[in-house]
Amino acid sequence: MIPNNTKFSNPLFGRILTAMVTPFKKNGAVDYELAIKLSNYLCENGSDGIVLCGTTGESPTLTWAEQHNLFVAVKGSLNSRSKVIVGTGSNCTSEAIEATQKAYEFGADGALVVVPYYNKPPQEGLYKHFSSIANAASDLPLMLYNIPGRTGCNLLPTTVNKLMNFPNILSIKAASGRIEEVTELRAACGSKLSIYSGDDSLLLPMLSVGAVGVVSVASHIVGLQLKTMIESFQKGEISIALDIHEKLQPLFKALFETTNPIPIKAALELRGWQVGSPRNPLTPLIKEKRESLLQIIQNLSL
């Protein structure tokens, strides 16, 4: 069921969505039991919902069967208590359509659909790609995902505005690293599009120009702090929000010192969550960066 509109005051997916890591056992298999425990912990500690099988979840190295089993495990545990959004994007339109349709069939609350990567389609190709997905899964709320640093392709606000004709395209994860992206999207699309920051470090600045929340990596370990920051901003307690924003900057920076999700997996292990190493070709965090990350975590009294 697609709502008639999405309100700035009450976004469909909530304010804080954790882009959850995929836990692996020592033998490299997905640890579904730990994924259930982690997702429940996150939703009890600040997160309004979980994004599975995104960048942080190492979707490029998960089989479709693993992605399906991961969703079934997590959604079955959380049930209706929290939103579960599934990454269904691909640089092959037919593959993305199939994945998005299956996400709907198995009860996902929404799908995160990334801009096609590597083949770098023009804007008309991006429009056709996303419109085809929206038509094929018309009852599933969709969140577009613009991350040109990874895809090599930028989804322009004018193209997003054209896509707003599809009632199930309700939101976008803006991860270009540019605060101006929010302003440009709001100028093109108005308030009918819910814009989520795709960068923890830019959450507060993006809130100030119209974003509704964040698809977060740091919320694995500072979800409650992020929740307080957003609530303080909403109440006009800007000095409190700014204080949290500034205190968390060293952590935000450390979590992206190297390729995500390498640092956040290390941070979780330092907090006692044995989520395993990333799958090849990603590698574990090197010793020096791990020690630096530990110091930051200790300084924050986490």
Curated annotation (Swiss-Prot):
Pyruvate binds at residues 56, 215. It catalyses: L-aspartate 4-semialdehyde + pyruvate = (2S,4S)-4-hydroxy-2,3,4,5-tetrahydrodipicolinate + H2O + H(+). It is found in: Cytoplasm. The record marks 55, 118 as: Part of a proton relay during catalysis. Gene3D superfamilies: Aldolase class I. Pathway: Amino-acid biosynthesis; L-lysine biosynthesis via DAP pathway; (S)-tetrahydrodipicolinate from L-aspartate: step 3/4. Its main location: cytoplasm. InterPro entries: Aldolase_TIM (IPR013785), DapA (IPR005263), DapA-like (IPR002220), Schiff_base-form_aldolases_AS (IPR020625), Schiff_base-form_aldolases_CS (IPR020624). The active site is at 145 (proton donor/acceptor), 173 (schiff-base intermediate with substrate). The keyword Ribonucleoprotein does not apply. GO terms for cellular component: cytosol. Its EC number is 4.3.3.7. Keywords: Amino-acid biosynthesis, Cytoplasm, Diaminopimelate biosynthesis, Lyase, Lysine biosynthesis, Schiff base. GO terms for molecular function: 4-hydroxy-tetrahydrodipicolinate synthase activity. One of its GO terms (biological process) is lysine biosynthetic process via diaminopimelate. It comes from the Bacteria. Coiled coil: none annotated. The keyword Cytoplasm applies. Catalyzes the condensation of (S)-aspartate-beta-semialdehyde [(S)-ASA] and pyruvate to 4-hydroxy-tetrahydrodipicolinate (HTPA). PANTHER family: 4-HYDROXY-2-OXOGLUTARATE ALDOLASE, MITOCHONDRIAL (PTHR12128:SF66), DIHYDRODIPICOLINATE SYNTHASE (PTHR12128). Homotetramer; dimer of dimers. Belongs to the DapA family. This is 4-hydroxy-tetrahydrodipicolinate synthase. It comes from Prochlorococcus marinus subsp. pastoris (strain CCMP1986 / NIES-2087 / MED4).
